[in-house]
């Protein structure tokens, strides 16, 4: 049985407003979930559903105002645990330009290990391994501001990999990228998950990205309201739409075909699956 890397027990989080007199804004409510090591989980939900707050709790940037969150078996509210928790979970944020601080790619990737006192020879090894993992070995001497958006996010991921995390959380990390950049980053994430068993928690509003995960958490009004694999989640087209979310175009097409009386599956997600299914229907006609 795989170890549990994230466990939330009745977690709530409330933001304080400007003054003590004004009420707190409760953005997470009675949140309960478990995520095992090696899972690839997408988290979706409309704006204001609590996705980004949940992401920041996972790295102990924020601490629950109620309930208990365990990361790698350690409670985030215990200050003595924070160092280890932040080494266990790395964060990649929305804007790649806000995460790169050095004047060369290799210096940026080395920044984290240098700041925790890793020996120089080990840092060199980690930088090379991290850049190889994200496919940027040939760019190690490059100036970060000369890179594309997708390449910059891959540098940010490499910087986290150099810290040897067990889990990477991406908070809308592809939202500012063009389709090519998103494709680059998603390939890296899948490789890290499948080849290196790194847990991936991907906060996204792109449904075509969510279907690449092995599990999807759907959030609404601070709660996890749906939990399942992509086929289970996106077969519930009307429920997803009622939550203010889009569904993958292929899933919506087959939902409409089914409503019109066609005998088609309700769990088709990709263009390739759609082509095969429609070809079989035509052949039988």
From Swiss-Prot:
<dbReference type="InterPro" id="IPR003439">
    <property type="entry name" value="ABC_transporter-like_ATP-bd"/>
</dbReference>
<protein>
    <recommendedName>
        <fullName>Energy-coupling factor transporter ATP-binding protein EcfA1</fullName>
        <ecNumber>7.-.-.-</ecNumber>
    </recommendedName>
</protein>
<comment type="subunit">
    <text>Forms a stable energy-coupling factor (ECF) transporter complex composed of 2 membrane-embedded substrate-binding proteins (S component), 2 ATP-binding proteins (A component) and 2 transmembrane proteins (T component).</text>
</comment>
<comment type="function">
    <text>ATP-binding (A) component of a common energy-coupling factor (ECF) ABC-transporter complex. Unlike classic ABC transporters this ECF transporter provides the energy necessary to transport a number of different substrates.</text>
</comment>
<dbReference type="InterPro" id="IPR017871">
    <property type="entry name" value="ABC_transporter-like_CS"/>
</dbReference>
<keyword id="KW-1278">Translocase</keyword>
<comment type="similarity">
    <text>Belongs to the ABC transporter superfamily. Energy-coupling factor EcfA family.</text>
</comment>
<dbReference type="Pfam" id="PF00005">
    <property type="entry name" value="ABC_tran"/>
</dbReference>
<dbReference type="InterPro" id="IPR015856">
    <property type="entry name" value="ABC_transpr_CbiO/EcfA_su"/>
</dbReference>
<dbReference type="InterPro" id="IPR003593">
    <property type="entry name" value="AAA+_ATPase"/>
</dbReference>
<dbReference type="GO" id="GO:0043190">
    <property type="term" value="C:ATP-binding cassette (ABC) transporter complex"/>
</dbReference>
<dbReference type="GO" id="GO:0042626">
    <property type="term" value="F:ATPase-coupled transmembrane transporter activity"/>
</dbReference>
<keyword id="KW-0813">Transport</keyword>
<feature type="binding site">
    <location>
        <begin position="45"/>
        <end position="52"/>
    </location>
    <ligand>
        <name>ATP</name>
    </ligand>
</feature>
<dbReference type="InterPro" id="IPR050095">
    <property type="entry name" value="ECF_ABC_transporter_ATP-bd"/>
</dbReference>
<keyword id="KW-0547">Nucleotide-binding</keyword>
<dbReference type="InterPro" id="IPR030947">
    <property type="entry name" value="EcfA_1"/>
</dbReference>
<dbReference type="GO" id="GO:0005524">
    <property type="term" value="F:ATP binding"/>
</dbReference>
<keyword id="KW-1003">Cell membrane</keyword>
<keyword id="KW-0472">Membrane</keyword>
<feature type="domain" description="ABC transporter">
    <location>
        <begin position="6"/>
        <end position="246"/>
    </location>
</feature>
<dbReference type="GO" id="GO:0016887">
    <property type="term" value="F:ATP hydrolysis activity"/>
</dbReference>
<dbReference type="InterPro" id="IPR027417">
    <property type="entry name" value="P-loop_NTPase"/>
</dbReference>
<keyword id="KW-0067">ATP-binding</keyword>
């Amino acid at each position: 049985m795989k170890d549990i890397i994230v466990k939330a027990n009745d977690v709530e989080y409330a933001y304080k407003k400007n003054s003590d007199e004004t009420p707190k804004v409760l953005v997470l409510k009675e949140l309960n979930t478990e995520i095992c090591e090696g899972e690839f989980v997408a988290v979706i939900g409309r704006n204001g559903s609590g996705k980004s707050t949940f992401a920041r709790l996972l790295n102990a940037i924020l601490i629950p105002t109620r309930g208990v969150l365990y990361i790698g078996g350690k409670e985030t509210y215990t200050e003595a645990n924070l160092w280890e928790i932040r080494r266990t979970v790395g964060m990649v944020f929305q804007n790649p330009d806000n995460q790169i601080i050095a004047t060369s790619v290799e210096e940026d990737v080395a920044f984290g290990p240098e700041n925790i006192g890793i020996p120089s020879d080990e840092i060199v090894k980690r930088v090379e391994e991290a850049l190889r993992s994200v496919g940027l070995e040939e760019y190690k001497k490059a100036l970060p501001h000369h890179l594309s958006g997708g390449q910059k996010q891959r540098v940010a991921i490499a910087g986290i990999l150099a810290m040897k995390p067990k889990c990477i959380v991406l908070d809308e990390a592809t939202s500012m990228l063009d389709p090519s950049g998103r494709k680059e980053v998603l390939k890296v994430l899948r490789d890290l998950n499948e080849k290196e068993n790194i847990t991936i928690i991907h906060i996204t509003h792109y449904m075509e990205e969510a279907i690449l995960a092995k599990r999807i958490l759907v959030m609404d009004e601070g709660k996890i309201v749906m939990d399942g694999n992509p086929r289970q989640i996106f077969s519930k087209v009307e429920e997803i739409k009622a939550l203010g979310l889009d569904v993958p175009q292929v899933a919506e097409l087959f939902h409409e075909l089914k409503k019109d009386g066609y005998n088609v599956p309700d769990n088709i997600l990709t263009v390739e699956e759609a082509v095969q299914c429609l070809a079989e229907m035509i052949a039988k006609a």
